[in-house]
Amino acid sequence: MSAAKDTKQFQYEIQEYQEDCIDNIVSIFDNLHQKEDFVEVLTAHKNKHKYNFPIQNTKNKNIDIMMETGTGKTFTFIKTIFELNKHYGYKKFIILVPSVPIREGTKTNLKDTKDYFKSVYANEREKEIETFVYEGGN
């Protein structure tokens, strides 16, 4: 007798605003490959899309992406990881979370969406996300 595997089967419906977010992020990276000036790239992107957020003139190349609660942030950033890998070959990403429950939820989402993204990106080099969890002090 073989025991049945307890697998989760989800139907994922990608929302237009999630695709817009992913496309925006990918386009910022596309422009970064063409220009050296990070602030110039972000300012042009902001003006093109008529966004209302401040651009800090800094040497650090940081992008803070925010979405409302319940909008599918985790799914969106996982898909963004695959898209950045597909378009630019990026392989290493750091995901920072503020608490243990959110970390555990993120790990669960990465596991639950594994088969979905494996099928969507079947022809890509990297089809799975390998994770390593760093906890302060270890």
Language-model features: where?
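RecA-like P-loop NTPase motor core of helicase/translocase proteins
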Residues: M1-N138
